[in-house]
Regions:
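Membrane-interface helix-loop junctions in multi-pass transport and translocation proteins
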Residues: 60-61, 94-138, 142-146
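Small-residue-rich hydrophobic transmembrane alpha-helices
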Residues: 1-40, 80-89, 96
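Interhelical loop/hinge segments that connect adjacent transmembrane helices in multipass membrane
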Residues: 122, 126-132, 138-186
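Alpha-helical transmembrane segments of multi-pass membrane proteins
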Residues: 22-35, 41-45, 57-83, 98, 105, 170-174, 178, ...
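Hydrophobic alpha-helical transmembrane bundles that constitute the permease/transmembrane domains
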Residues: 1-4, 40-41, 74-82, 86-90, ...
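Membrane-embedded alpha-helical segments of multi-pass transporters/permeases
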Residues: 37-44, 52, 69, 108, ...
Length: 188
């Protein structure tokens, strides 16, 4: 779904319709948050789903513990992907790389502390992933709001993001199907 952000934002950037880029990013965030809500139910009941497709009970139970710890990550991912595509469409990639490396290094430290030192195990591992993604969202958001590089493209939150959401949804759905088809065809 996020690949549509890069396409549409890239077109807006090329057409010098800079203010439209922020609206496109917000529209994508709204759709991604909707998808995250739907996926939350799958994560909550992953034990039953996994057992229904033949996974053993013990593995399904452990997978559910891990999946439930990843629920906050779903929402962070819903925010992060459109923001990253928004920045990439403007050729702002070095700050993204620096933020990602910084969060990765903190993630290593957090994982060691939470799993090895504090002993939180599987749930700790998934919650650490969620924490790291939220740190990345915060850094990306601060960069977008505070950086002079985004002054023309980010004009603040707007209700315009809800206008034209259905055509944008159709574009993102088509993009997701296309990417799934490409992935599936190469895995055969």
């Amino acid at each position: 779904m996020a690949s549509a952000v890069q396409t549409v934002c890239g077109q807006a950037y090329g057409a010098k319709k800079y203010a439209a880029m922020g609206i496109i990013c917000q529209r994508a965030i709204v759709l991604h948050l909707g998808a995250a809500v739907l996926l939350t139910f799958l994560y909550c009941y992953s034990d039953a789903v996994l057992q229904a497709i033949g996974q053993s009970k013990s593995i399904a139970e452990q997978a559910q513990v891990f999946a439930r710890g990843l629920i906050p990550q779903l929402y962070a991912f819903a925010l992060s992907c459109p923001m990253q595509r928004f920045l990439q469409a403007q050729n702002i990639v070095n700050p993204l790389a620096f933020m990602s490396v910084g969060v990765f290094l903190l993630h290593i430290l957090f994982t060691w502390l939470i799993i090895d030192i504090m002993g939180y195990g599987l749930l700790g591992a998934s919650l650490t992933l969620s924490l790291s993604w939220w740190l990345l969202v915060i850094l990306n958001g601060l960069y977008i709001v505070l950086s002079p590089s985004c002054k023309e493209t980010w004009t603040g939150l707007s209700f315009k993001a809800f206008k034209g959401i259905w055509p944008y949804f159709k574009l993102t759905a088509a993009s997701a199907v296309m990417l799934w088809y490409i992935y599936f065809s190469f895995s055969i």
